[in-house]
């Protein structure tokens, strides 16, 4: 054939082939087989723009024909027209000239360290690195090479995937690398298209190496649009200012000799190794380029050479510069510049030396000031200088006055302590609590007590009986004292010092109860009696006789003297020899008539009839028949007494005044002392001080007190708050302020604050009492060491105390209300020594007693000096505690802090106050200490004796121990040594505890069988990601205020502090926890101690941590501002494309020009152009609730590519979802499809804002032209989070609904989820909410004044964790937070079938809007509509609320349904006959009966469900008499009184907390909640902050945990509940957790901006279990237990292996089955190879529709046509037979039947089936009935050897059958989990 013809035929063939390919289906696989196998083609040529088919042919040859070709010795060539033209046309390459010999490159071994160094540099690009050395000479150039397509493709793909080059294999295709992410794939293909101009067909399926080969032939070797743009962005965003691409290229050329092509390659390599942040200097940039060049060299297989060290000297014409000439030139230039500067200065009239002159003057002034400061410090000292700094701030004042709330809280705490057996008897502490409650009694509190006491279930045990008895008595007490003033009455035990020395030589001190003095009443008597040391010194009888003798003898005669001498001698002998006269007594004492003792005996003390009597006597006011003053012994000074000034000017004991004081003390001890309407200032009342005890007494007596503290902190304010919460009486107020009594400014500011009007920021008080007890110790300072501290102490205790009194005097406005000042005097007038100026300070105060007379302030201040005796345990005296017992043995008295406070408070009685107004009063409270001579020596001896005894015993103990060890061995003490047992962690992950069925039935016995469980929605799983980790760890902190060991371990794991290791560690096998940083083992017992502080610091509400928010620092919040530039700017360099864009924007205000060396462009912005310049402002929202630092999705097992792809909020949602599933016992989500169709699993979770990080990227980062992923838009959608959950975990095809309800989103989600389940659209739904925290939202919330200002809070002395304070007086806005919360909800019926844990029942949910308005965030009360209920003039409640009534109606309806079902089954024979006539020969009776029976059963179930729904679930709906809330509770036989807790939205805003409290209160009131039964208010946001979308989900989780534990967590930040909330009697605001005896139901309310109100009510699952029969419940309990064990194992493995989250890589069905599964609602998975998958058999299965019971029944019915005429069909519901009724069973079943049924797998079904068989048999007999109540015991159903039922008739039944002609009865029984059916046939 001629060549021309061949060419024409070839052309025709090619055309036809192309036409065929375009017009017909592609059959390329078959085509390849034809030419490769049939024709053995060796040369295959593709004609086209790229080697698409050629590539496929190459892969086919490699995979299919490799061995085939080898066998036939075929050498195939696959060529492409566009790529292999030379091979196709056989065009040889021209011969190349031999290359010149090149220097040897460095060896690979030598370059390896350089590469390693470069890699190290790349990991820390931002670190400060020394700039590379400057080239000493020219570098040898490397032959240039254009960029290869392989490198370009590799870089573009790796950069898009955010991976290093070595993590992207070239052997994989793009489709494989993107892992199914179509968006990323499209981005890569788009970038390749831009870069190369065109792409081959299906490039995503081609391996990168092949794709590179296809591109290489047409690739020019220059960078395209995409790579140029990326490099330009790298240079502008990560290089230091001024370091442009031109600089980079020049550096690479000079440093390494790289040409333009290789420079491009290095810059491409840099794209995959971008620094984390902008490099700081040019040196850093060059170091970075060095690293990138080395990476490129390693990749390209070349060696980089450095500049030649001798290059500078090797040049022939190198110039040499004379250094002297250079220096002269530089000096001349500087001189010229200086002359020009001076000339310009003269012209501008500027003095160049002005600054220097001013500096000299400032320096001189500074020197003078420094000298003065040095002098001042030298005189006063450093301690004094620091000590006088003022600290007072009225902003930091804390006011406590919410006694009304704490009274109810304390009462409940005591109540539950009694019920739980913690308080079993009435001790002093209990009586004290009762007194405090009585002090706060009001009508509301009495109603509160009455409700709990009257409804106390005493049948529960003795503790409940005790609680009722004591409660009734306390109620009576409170009623008696209503309207009376509160009193301070201390009923504590009196204690004394006791010091012992143990056998081991330890000195042990304790406060021991005094048995002889048990009450303060007896204590006062003891004080009045004094002691041996306080007796007045009197002469003896002998001395009196001697004086008489001398006086008489002077006047007597001589004889008389002799006679008198004789009588005197005889008297002396009588006195000395008498046993009746004590010679040491005075004459007066010897002749005195003894008086009766007032000391109560032990018998008197124990004579009370019962504990109740002691409480009952509390309100009584006892009249004192014989005052204690009458018992003061003559010539004895009481331990406590009042002194008056004698004529000599000395202070001496005054019996009259002392009597007044002691009688007042006695009255205070017996009847109490009130301080109502008293305004008091107390300083020096720190913990453990006398002042603190005084303060406690003042507020318990109703005083209004301002107390100061010099150590202001959260710990200190909590101390005072706790004191007030416990002791604050009605009408009392406690105000705490920071105050330094050493500062004059603070003294003035404090008094100004007290007296200023409230409008001026003050209190507007007028002080009645001043108790200035502030002091600091000066131990160890003698007169030779009076230092700075001593002087400062003197200033506090004297100077500024006087200033304080003077300031009060100056502000006193009336002379009729003087302030009583209790001066803290001391008996220590240098007695102890070495106490600095302490004694001098105290003595100097005594001058005020004289100045009261001599100065003009006597009508405004009164003086009462209190000489304070030895008080044990105070800061000043605690070191002397051990010798106090020895001191008391001398006959004096030391005091406890309570005793001394009682003594001082006794000075505030009206009688003493009146005395003070007449004259200054000196009260000696020294206990007789002043009568001890040489006190210092005696105390020293006591101390030395104790120390010596201790030393001796210690030495003896040591010696004995040594001897024992020598004799008995070293381990002799092992059995006696104290061992501290530290338990190991036990992480349980428990499911809710299930009670026994009998306990369940006691809860609600009438609920069994009442509800349609498919219309009951339950929570089976819940979880969260929040500031406190997860739901478990958050609950520990919320309920207990601290982490358990297990909680600490979990938090440490979450925060990346520890990880689990199983393998070799440092060469040894180790399994356990290790520190994540040091890789060292950590014992689980030590984790809490080691990491807890760091955990607490970096979790919860805290200062914003910039590393969590991409560097966002609110202290430097960045914003931009537009400015017009005033002069031309310096030019800068960028790419051509970017330069043109600048020109396009700025027009003639911008000049651009090309830079010839690099091809880059120079840009110059001209005057008049507008620029946006960044600025930073100090933003005051510095605090937020943040995810724990170190939280990482990788810890849970989420893949890296997913983390890089999605918004951070999506990660929170994924983790919360998988934890929620595990909480539900679901370890594989595909298990759902074993029970439900894929269309029945939905997701209704939502968010307020969605992916805010993605939104930020879309708007802010994109606007700033920062790198942003191209598919960022999809991550911003609110429904994307749900989409990821489905794509990675569920693979469901059910409803997806995405609520957006601002802060109410989560509860709205629950509402939608419930509706979705109840409507039948789904059976399992994921609900919840989620939101992130970002600076944009934070700023806008601040602009709305919705959030609290951290700066303002800091000024008020608040710590970050205190800044969210719902319900408090000082609440000031909500605190933002971030996180997610998810619940798994499903129908109760499904939950029971699956055996998943049921955490709570969702009894009700609702949403509501509010009224007309103009404010979107304004709070409203629309949600009150859940309590909508018409009352009108209706007198009687609806019978529908009575469960017994509803049960009766349901029973009737079920009987009707059973009758209908039986009749339908009976009619089936006739129906089959008619159908046979209709369908003819094709008719199958068996199939017809099966299908129709199934339909009847299904219809019966539907009718039963509707009946239960009508009378159980939905009876209240649309009934105006029954509120939705009331009806939802009544469904479970609960009332409005059974809502135990209301979880408040509680945002800590003024408006919300009041509005929400009013709403809940109105709701309870309208629905008739009992008075005195407030709900516990839970305000979770004090702990977590406000996460917006997740808020309701976290609250719901907390509500579930409340139901499970019975613990009601308190609002620990509620330091003082707002007075305005007192009006809401139906809400209690606890500040601490209270363990109750069970919570039945919890209400959760949520409110969102945009008129969103929502409420959900959860009920304890016990009320659901009460609906079940015993068999169903016990079967469920078994399956839950098994699931719990499985989940327990999974959770432990998940934590130790970081595999909690396991992403699904495929759906549970193959692609081929997708549509089949979708279209078959009965398709279910089966478990194959440990996986749940759909199979062909499971889709459209013949067995999936007709149930076993229908088959069995149909089979029995089909035999009716062939059998006898007596037929009986009976249907019984399993739920209707009460097998717990023993009487019923014994009456209707034989013992054998009972035994058989009880031993069956399902006793409920077995009994029901047997009963149905009995009924069917009776019907088959056709005999007359004996009535509905007749026993069926005579019809016995027995089982044969095969288990088949047989009928045995006995007695009357047998006789009736015989009379009817019945010979035998055959019966068939079938049942499922819903009903049992029996068909009986009689044989005649």
Swiss-Prot record:
Bias type Low complexity, positions: 111-129
Domain Carrier: 147-222
Chain positions with O-(pantetheine 4'-phosphoryl)serine modification: 182
Residues annotated for Mg(2+) binding in this entry: 1770-1772, 1870-1871
Domain of life: Eukaryota
Catalytic activity: acetyl-CoA + n malonyl-CoA + 2n NADPH + 4n H(+) = a long-chain-acyl-CoA + n CoA + n CO2 + 2n NADP(+); a fatty acyl-[ACP] + malonyl-[ACP] + H(+) = a 3-oxoacyl-[ACP] + holo-[ACP] + CO2; a (3R)-hydroxyacyl-[ACP] + NADP(+) = a 3-oxoacyl-[ACP] + NADPH + H(+)
Residue numbers annotated as active site: 1303 (for beta-ketoacyl synthase activity), 1545 (for beta-ketoacyl synthase activity), 1586 (for beta-ketoacyl synthase activity)
Protein induction: Expression significantly elevated by the presence of glucose. Down-regulated by unsaturated fatty acids oleic acid and Tween 80. Up-regulated during in vitro biofilm formation and hypoxic conditions.
Gene inactivation effect: Essential for growth in fatty acid-free medium, but dispensable in medium with fatty acids. The growth in the presence of fatty acid depends on the type. Able to grow in a concentration-dependent manner in the presence of myristic acid, palmitic acid, or Tween 80 as the fatty acid sources, but unable to grow in the presence of unsaturated fatty like acids stearic acid or oleic acid. Intracellular survival in the murine macrophage line J774.16 is significantly reduced compared to wild type or heterozygous fungal cells. Required for systemic infection in mice.
SUPFAM superfamilies membership: 4'-phosphopantetheinyl transferase (SSF56214), FabD/lysophospholipase-like (SSF52151), NAD(P)-binding Rossmann-fold domains (SSF51735), Thiolase-like (SSF53901)
Stretches the record annotates as Disordered: 91-141, 583-613
GO biological process, one term: single-species biofilm formation on inanimate substrate
Biased composition (Polar residues): 584-600
Positions of acetyl-CoA binding: 1770-1772, 1796, 1806, 1815-1825, 1839-1842, 1869-1871
Gene3D superfamilies given in the database record: 3.30.70.2490, 3.40.47.10, 3.90.25.70, 4'-phosphopantetheinyl transferase domain, 6.10.140.1410, 6.10.250.1930, NAD(P)-binding Rossmann-like Domain
One Gene Ontology term of the molecular function aspect: holo-[acyl-carrier-protein] synthase activity
Keywords in alphabetical order: Fatty acid biosynthesis, Fatty acid metabolism, Lipid biosynthesis, Lipid metabolism, Magnesium, Metal-binding, Multifunctional enzyme, NAD, NADP, Oxidoreductase, Phosphopantetheine, Phosphoprotein, Transferase
Acidic residues bias locations: 601-613
Described function: Fatty acid synthetase catalyzes the formation of long-chain fatty acids from acetyl-CoA, malonyl-CoA and NADPH. The alpha subunit contains domains for: acyl carrier protein, 3-oxoacyl-[acyl-carrier-protein] reductase, and 3-oxoacyl-[acyl-carrier-protein] synthase.
Note: It can potentially be a fungicidal target. Inhibition of FAS2 by cerulenin impeds the growth of wild-type and heterozygous strains.
This protein's name: Fatty acid synthase subunit alpha
Organism of origin: Candida parapsilosis (strain CDC 317 / ATCC MYA-4646) (Yeast)
Gene designation per UniProt: FAS2
